[in-house]
Every structure is written in structure tokens, then in C-alpha cells.
């Protein structure tokens, strides 16, 4: 046995891409990968299980790479066909993680083993053996506090997700990671027996019919080369890629043996077939499989319009990873391009498998009229580059096809033309127009930089996309205009709403992840104003449920902010009519309580105006308003929609539509109709679990042992936000 101190804990993440196209993408998507995980029972709980990464031990003096590859093969033999096991391409050390408990002071290494792209091979499920899981499904429920994973495995999976995201942004890294191993790339190895460099190697050690001297003499007798040409690229570090003209995948591969009884043998006169007939078959198959591509390629405007009316997708990629608009732009079909953009609402920056855009194709073909159409489109990214970092102008000047001079002139002029703008609204209804330097490829981060906010103020806010009944916070790398374009599909995925009644707009709003301790330190008047406008909006809409006394105080502050100091002649009993109350009292209280509050509101308003200890500067009053809002449980929450079921009688259930609020304090349920706060749970006092179908999640309160299920298509978003915000509470906030 080896020395225990020389034995290292090693965890292995075996990952494989679902398709080859994802390897060339600069944007990381977890759903494009699968990861190999074990399921092991939780100690003391027979029925419950948790997922763990593959784990092995490494001797300090052993060959690590081969040891890990052999371990993966042996571990996966029971689940693979013919007991072959999964053979990794290489072993990459990602990171070392400190261990807890008895092993404190030691570290465990996480090794990544990339495997082949997923195919139709069917793996058998064997109890106790690992199986592949979709990485996106795993990351949706992965957190260090989740009962679904071992704590160390959860930390490693979160680090792996971040690592893959960073590596996708590096050119050529991901394709190199999944490239076949050097051993796989060696096809033939030839050794010259006459080449003996070791002094101890004699003719007897060659074990061949000829001695080394005889072989050497025969070689010298052969005709020698007159010229020797060296490859100047050999041994250099220059990047190169093999250009593939066409990739053809056998659709029947992996489907098993065919039913030979159904195979029809053609007549003998048809046996001799030329390559041209084979090509014709392939073209006919392409025409049948991709009618929209064919009509775009041929410029058949009538057929193209009819297919679009039949809901054929403009985003579908064919076997060459081209979309219909790529064919229209490459072959110079002007009307087809216009129809795809206008009627088909096609993304003008849609990329093919080699990351080339429609503008690249039109410029490369020298089709000036199509270049003009694309440049006139408000969402086109004029600065877009392909996989090799080339702009459309570079491609145009390289190819020099057709009317390339005119196309190049248009591209050069477009660089200095004014950019399209998008309105970013604030919650008070005002907006700022921001330039879209990259069309609909412009990211949230780039829009935030165009908002003319200071660096300090930017960190408190982000861009939200909102319609009447759905609001989503976007991430810095998201492209808001593409979300606006895809809003009907997003609505269908997350709600049952009618897209015709939901018009999306972009808003500058408080970042839901902003800790209250940080917000309390804000002094910038502009930041305070933006926060105030949003808090006032949520208060009046009824999302801030609070005691009557708190709502009356907030109403008096709003009167001071809107109308200035109290004047007895001006602000009489009838001053607070129904119209004025709408601007200071939540909509849920207007009819039930607001008429009885008028005297109390005016009284507090008068006291506030005459108080010498209160600053009447606008940002100080707005800050006082925020200070009162900070105490409300739902302050700063992102709201989702859902339903809960309660027993109306022993025989049936009552459906209650609810708002699900998630903030840095915890989770809150509001009755959708009355805005009454049904339940408010702080982190640490409840547990959650995502349902199997991602259409519900379960909440268990540890204080009163109560459990309930919320049914919503947004369950995945709710659980992911809970995992992000859990643990962000400051110690001083936990008891407040």
C-alpha cells in the first residue's frame, strides 16, 4: 500500500457535447452538454439519493492522465454497449478544492475528461453506475445547500459551469478540448530499421532478414531527391483549421440492423449508376427536407410567402448549418431576402455554423442591393465578425464577386452613419434613447454603458424586459432586442398569456440581487430618484403590503414630495379627492380604506411640513420614503405568477392565483386579486424543491411544518433565483 499522504482525492467530470455545432459557438449554453454523475443513497435516508461526481484516488507517483482515463473506462463498462467503456480524449486539471471535516487542510482535484459528441448509441441503465444528465437541468437545481447533491460536488459543478462559460469566449479553446487525442490522430507508424542511434543496438537486435548495414546500402542505391522543400509552417504556432465544404450525416447510423424483408432490389438495368445520379438523390432529399431553404435559394417569392404563412421556421439550419436567409443573400435573391426579413421577421444577424451572418454572405457575393437592405434594417450589426474575426467588408474585398465595389462602398459609408436607438424607460414613464452600435446584437452591458450613468450608479441597476403581466431581469450578456423579438415565444414558454396583449418594453430597474446593506449606503441623488420612482410604482400597484400606519406615513411623504409644504388654505378637507388619492395610496386600499384615512394623511403631512428636524430637499425626502419601504417584506422583489390549491371542501379544491415574490429576504406569496400577503418566509426558515416537470415547485416551512406546492411555468426561474439570493442576507438583516 502507498503512503496515505501521497494519495490524492480526484474527482472526474466526464462531459460530452450534444452536437458538433455547439463546439464552434462563442456563447456558452449549458443545455448543449451532458455530464456523467453517480447517484448514491443519503446516509440515514434509504429512499432519498444524491448525485456525486466520479471519484477516485491517485498515487502521488502514478501517471495521472492514463490512470484517470483507465478509471473512466472501467467505471462506464457496465453501461456501454459491448462492455467497451467510455474513452476520454484527454485529462484537464480544472481546479483544486479545499476539503472540510476530517480531511481539512487537504485538497481534492477536479479533472475534466472530454468525451465524444453524443450519438445514437443507447446506454443501458445499471444500478450503482453513472449515467449522463443534461448539464442545464443539473445547474437549474444545483447549489451548495441543495439536498440533490453532495456539497463538494455542488461546488465543483458551479465552478465547472463558470469555467465552460469563460472558455467558450476564448477562440479555438472548446474545439481543441474535444479534438481527438494525439494517439487517435496517428494512423500509421513506420520505423526505419537502418536508423540506429543507440550505441548498443547491433544487427542482431534488429531481428530482421537483413542487417542494418545491408539495408543502408540498399537505400543508398536508390535514386536520391534532387530538391528538398521544407514546409515553412511546420513547427510554427500558427493556428490552422481544416475547411470542410460539406458534412453529410447518415440518418440511419445507430438505428440498428434494418429489416431486410422490406428491402427492394432494383432491376439489373439500374445497377450501374453514375455519381451524378447519387448527387441528384442528395439534392432531391435536401429539397424535400428543407422547402423554405430551396425557395429562398431559387428566389421563389410566391412559394416562400406561402411557406411562411404555414409557419415554417426562418431560423431552421439545414445539414450544412445554413438558414434560408443565408441562401437568399449568397445567391443574390433580393425579393426573397426582403420577404424573410419583413414577413418572416428573420433575425438579420442570424449566424450559420461558421458564425457568418447574412451581411457576410451578401458582401461576399457582391450583392450590393441586398447589402443595402440589410444595412437599412434597424437591427443589423454593422460591426459583426465571423469565426476568423473578419468583417463583411473584409469578405467583400477578398472575394471581389459581382458588384463588389458598390457593396464595399455601402459598407464603408455605413460605418459612420448614425445608429438606430432604443428607448430605455424608467418607472416614472420617462426614457432615454440609447444607440444600438451592434444592432440587435447589442448586449445589456453595452446599453448600460450608453445610459450615461456613473460607474457607481450602474452597479445598482440593470435592464428588465417587461410587458403587462411578465417582467424578467436580463443578464449583462443578454441581447435585449432579441428578447423583444422572441417575446411571443418566451410568453408561450413561461405563461398562458395571449402574446397579442403583451407588448414588451425595456426598463432600467433595481437589480434584484442588490443587498439592502449596500442600498442603505447610496448617496447619489440620481440613484435615489430611480429607486424612489420604482418603489412608488410598486407601492401604488399594491405589491408592498404593509400595516395601515406605514401606508399613511408613505402617503404623507408622497404629498410632501409632490405638493411641497402644507398650506392650510390650499390643502383643505376636500383636497384629497379620489383622483389625488390614486397618486399616494395603493390601488387595493382606494375604496376600502382610503376615504377614512384622509384626515390622518393630512395630519401627518402637516406635521412633516412643519417639522424643523426634517430636511425638505427632494433627495432627502425620497430617501426617507425608501427607508420606510425597506421594512416592507416584499421590497425589491422580482414577482412571478402562479397558482396554489387549497381545500374548499373535502371533495374539491379551490384555485388561488398568486404572485410569487423573491428578494434577498426570502419568498413571499401575494393573492393576485387582493394583493394580500398570504405567506412570507425568510431564508433559513424554509426549503424548496423543483418539480420533475419544471412546472411547479414545493415549499416546506420549517417553523410551522407547513408544505405547499406552487404551480407555474416559471418554476425554474423562481428556484434559480432562490438559489442565487440564498445566503446574501447580511447578519444584521437576518433578525430584522
Swiss-Prot record:
What are the boundaries of the region Interaction with ITGB1BP1? Answer: 172-195
Annotated keywords: Angiogenesis, ANK repeat, Cell junction, Cell membrane, Cytoplasm, Cytoskeleton, Disease variant, Membrane, Repeat
Please list where the region (N-terminal domain similar to Nudix hydrolase domain) is annotated. Answer: 1-170
Domain called FERM: residue spans = 420-734
Q: Give one GO term, molecular function aspect.
A: GTPase regulator activity
Please give the annotated consequence of changing residue 179 to A. Answer: Strongly reduces ITGB1BP1 binding
Q: How does it assemble?
A: Interacts with CDH5. Found in a complex, at least composed of ITGB1BP1, KRIT1 and RAP1A. Interacts (via C-terminus FERM domain) with RAP1A (active GTP-bound form preferentially); the interaction does not induce the opening conformation of KRIT1. Interacts (via FERM domain) with RAP1B. Interacts (via N-terminus NPXY motif) with ITGB1BP1; the interaction induces the opening conformation of KRIT1 and competes with ITGB1 for ITGB1BP1 interaction. Interacts with HEG1 and CCM2; greatly facilitates CCM2-binding to HEG1.
Higher taxonomy: Eukaryota, Metazoa, Chordata, Craniata, Vertebrata
User: Impact of mutating residue 721 to A?
Assistant: Strongly reduced affinity for HEG1
Membrane topology category: Peripheral membrane protein
Which organism does this record belong to? Homo sapiens (Human)
Give the protein name, as stated in the record.
Krev interaction trapped protein 1
ANK repeat positions in this chain? 287-316, 320-350, 354-383, 388-419
Query: Where does this one sit in the cell?
Result: Cytoplasm, Cytoskeleton; Cell membrane; Cell junction
